[in-house]
Every structure is written in structure tokens, then in C-alpha cells.
Amino acid sequence: MPTITIFGATGSQGSAVLNAVLADGKYTPRAVSRSLESDASKALIAKGVEVVKANLFDVDSLKAALRGSEAVFGVTNFWDPEVFPADPKGKGEITQGKNLVDAAKAEGVKFFMWSSLPNATETSKGLYKHIYHVDNKAIIEDYLRASGVPHAVLLTGWFAENIYKLGALKKTETGYTFPMPMYKAEDTQSATWVSHDLGAAAVALLSNYTDPSKGILGSSFPVISMKFTYPQLAKAIAAAINKEVTFTSLPTSGLQEVDEMYEYQAKIGMYADTPVPNPALVALGVKFGTMEEFIKADVVPRFA
């Protein structure tokens, strides 16, 4: 079987793609890790997954990791301690992404799937220009597009899994509060159920990219599972777990970058014009999850 090399395979996005590739069974996944001795790497090895060591700051290690791969799923992490807060603008993330593109080009990768985000500075016409973890990915995307490497772009929203992975719900005596910085009750959020939908979208692109009629190469695909106001989400969770869940709007997160991100999402919206579910991905066979399905599968077992 052809090989797809997956970066971030021990994180939220890469693991979603890895699991979907394994379930699909048409490609052999190769996971990339900075350490083969980490618990996450050992868990993948125990499952029979090939895990190779590479560092996004080391182009030669990236070339070795990609050697013989038909495809790659690429993602970078602004919050990586090697990137931030050493540099508040996280320019190292751009270096990492460009290194990955260069390595993919050198190794003749036939299909590069990049996990990106819209450029906040450009789409807000300069109103929000400090959301570096968003803009950096868009800058890398531009570099990929100019590189000549055959590619497609996957765009994600707010991770629905943040509800439990980042502790968005706070326990109270009677239930939970759902505090969100910068968001008002009427503001809409666009969210991605990463573990359910991102991998499915990646596999759909991977399975169809060689067919010109599908229009995949060079295209962008927002992977938006659901849209909601936070009071709507809180109400749905409350009904499912039979406990009080109250949304509260916070004036700040304590970090300018995060405040600008949430205000940008709330006031302008990364995906205001993207229908849910994305018809381009539905046409490729992606079956998106719904907010209700996400709550039943991921929230109820943890909070009921």
C-alpha cells in the first residue's frame, strides 16, 4: 500500500487523521514524532504503526521521514515550547512549516494536505493583527501554494473537544458554568469535531485527489461540523446531562493573542460564509457529525 506520513500524529489533528487512515485501510500511515520514547509514540508502535523520529527545525530529518511517501498530512503547533513563548510572534512556526514544504518537494511527495487557518490580519483588514498562531499557518499555506507541491488545504474551526480537553466547562455546586472570553450571547462560533470529522475529510481528499473532476488539488476545504451561539451549546449540553450549564461572557482571557482571536471569531467569523455541512466534502462522501451527536458521544460520558 502507498504511504502517508502524518505529522502531529500524537496530537488532536494528526491522531484524527491517523485513525481515519487506519480505518480506511487504503494507505499505510507513518507517524512522525520528536521522540520515539514518549508514551504516545510507544502506544502507536504497540498498535503496529510505523513511527519515525523527525524535528520540524531539521530539514534533513524531515526528508528522511518523508522518503517513499505518496502523501503527507502537515500541521504545526504555535504553542510548542520551542516556538512560543520564546518568540511571542512564533516565527519559528513559519520556519517549521516552510521546512516541511521544502522537504516534501525534495522527496517528490505527490499530495500534501495542510492544516491551515484564514489569515486574520488580511480578512479583518488589519483590525486584528496579533493573532500569530492563526496568521502563521496562512503564511505557510501561501508558501505551499507557491512551491509547486500538489496540495489541498484543510481549514479547522474552534475545536469542539476544547469543552473537555481545555476545561471549558467549570464545575459549580449545581452544575457547570461555560465561560468564554470576548464572546457575547448572540455571537456565533464555527466548530470542528476534530476526532470525528477532520480525519474523514482528509481520507476523502486522499482517496480522490488523483481525479481532476473532483477539483481537490489547489483547493481549500473548511471542515466545520457545527455552528452555534454559546448559550445554544450550553442549553443543549444541559439537556443532555440533566444539569445546569450557564454561559458567561468574560472580558478577557488574560492574553492579547487569545482575546483578539476570540473577538475576531465573534465579530467577523472565520467561516461566516461556509455552509454546514460543507457541500464540497459531503460530495466526497464525508458524513459530518452534528452538535447533538458530539454531545452524546463526547460530553455526556464525561459530565453527566
Please report, for each region that a protein language model flagged, where it lies by residue.
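A hydrophobic C-terminal alpha-helical subdomain
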Residues: 213-216, 241, 249-304
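Rossmann-fold cofactor-recognition segment
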Residues: 44-58
